[in-house]
UniProtKB/Swiss-Prot annotation:
Any single GO CC term annotated in Swiss-Prot or TrEMBL for this entry: cytosol
Gene name of this polypeptide: pgk
Manganese recorded as keyword: no
UniProtKB keywords: ATP-binding, Cytoplasm, Glycolysis, Kinase, Nucleotide-binding, Transferase
HAMAP family assigned to the protein according to its UniProt record, in alphabetical order: Phosphoglyc_kinase
Binding site for substrate: 21-23, 36, 59-62, 118, 151
Main location: cytoplasm
Species of provenance: Borrelia hermsii (strain HS1 / DAH)
Protein name per UniProt: Phosphoglycerate kinase
């Protein structure tokens, strides 16, 4: 999809109303990970350099339409001031006379941050009146919050009815790389899809199947596919109601000549607990009473083998119970293999992104997506409301 970007407009002396995703983790009022704030810097710096008056807005947490200081963006304003090397004024609200006065007093290159837009329930209701009030803070609407692009909220979609709408650099980058995956990926194209449930990933699997040369299926959902193929899976996760769906998917993969890689060996445990003792099973079949928790060495070697020649790779979702250290090796190793691949590599989805960040590999990945649910819906082929309003 081709979107309008900030380079398509002259921002000199204009008020740029920028929707960012500053939904950062906080502990006792302190930011524990500022990745999302840093991701917005290129857009903010560019707008400043063009002489814009930059008005930033975001949500933080789930205040459920009520003013709750626990979810104030004050810590974000403080961190932004440090990163930008200038004072970022924190405004007491996101609409109203006090905000209007502060915005009208801005000079070119100034940056202010509006208070949490989710202090108003009308934000998530995509209320026209609220979007109109927000629009009074800007001349041009810039959406740089890909992480919320799948939500039709006042600040992600509704504003486009009242202001010219463009995408920031982060939005443009997400659209470019995820779009490339869906439209014309260079072959060989390898899709690695993990996660616990077939039900939550089947739409992505079906969307990527016709474009893939090889598809790796891992995580808890792999056991439903192994069951379809006649293997015993012990006490591993099984979605009985998705047996037919999985069977039909494997049949379609065969018809399309897509090589599907399922686990060839396993790391298992007797109980689904963090302190369970890992046991290795050198076979596709899992013994009775055992639960599949991670992929084994044979499976990892097979994945490494297909990634060596891959020209395009998309990885979404963990290959094992990544949150338990004893069962995180499969996901960690796949992160290494993807990082070593010489082709275009795109990683999206909470746990796969966490793995890449945990092992300091993000610099070696072509594109690490900032959107969890948004990335997933984009890869499913859905039209995202926050991107649709930016189309050329």
């Amino acid at each position: 999809m081709s979107i309008k970007t900030i380079k398509d407009f002259d921002f000199s002396g204009k008020r740029a109303l920028v929707r960012c995703d500053f939904n950062v983790p906080l502990r006792e009022g302190n930011i524990t990970d500022d990745t999302r704030i840093r991701a917005a810097l290129p857009t903010i710096e560019y707008l400043k350099s063009q002489g814009a008056r930059v008005v930033l807005m975001s949500h933080l947490g789930r205040p459920k339409g009520e003013r709750n200081l626990k979810y104030s963006l004050m810590p974000v304003a403080k961190r932004l001031s440090e990163l930008l090397g200038q004072d970022v004024k924190m405004l007491p609200d996101c609409i109203g006379d006090e905000v209007a006065t502060a915005v009208s007093n801005m000079k070119n290159g100034d940056v202010v941050l509006l208070e949490n837009i989710r202090f108003y329930r009308q934000e998530e209701e995509n209320c026209n009146d609220f979007a109109k009030k927000l629009s009074q803070n800007g001349d041009i609407f810039v959406n740089d919050a890909f992480g919320t692009a799948h939500r039709a909220h006042a600040s992600t979609a509704g504003l486009a009815a009242y202001l010219p709408a463009v995408g920031g650099f982060l939005m443009e980058k997400e659209d470019e790389f995820l779009g490339k995956i869906l439209k014309n990926p260079e072959s060989p194209f390898v899709s690695i899809i993990g996660g616990s449930k077939v039900s939550s990933k089947i739409a992505v699997l079906e969307s990527l199947l016709p474009k893939s040369n090889v598809m790796v299926i891992g995580g808890g959902m792999a056991y439903t596919f192994l069951k379809v193929e006649g293997h015993s899976i012990g006490k591993s996760l099984l979605e009985n109601e998705y047996i037919d769906v999985a069977a039909s998917f494997l049949k379609k993969a065969k018809e399309l000549d897509v090589k599907v890689i399922l686990p060839l060996d396993h790391i298992v445990a007797s109980e689904f607990k963090e302190d369970s003792i890992p046991e290795y099973v050198d076979a596709i079949d899992i013994p009775d009473g055992k639960i599949g928790m991670d992929i084994g060495e044979k499976t990892l070697r097979k994945i490494e083998e297909v990634l060596v020649s891959a020209k395009t790779v998309i990885w979404n979702g963990p290959l094992g119970v990544f949150e338990f250290d004893s069962f995180s090796k499969g996901t960690a190793k796949v992160a290494e293999y993807v990082a070593s691949c010489s082709g275009i590599t795109v990683v999206g989805g909470g746990d796969s992104v966490a793995a890449v960040n945990k092992f300091n590999l993000s610099e070696k990945i072509t594109h690490v997506s900032t959107g969890g649910g948004a990335s997933l819906e984009y890869l499913e082929g859905k039209i995202l409301p926050g991107i649709k309003v930016l189309e050329k």
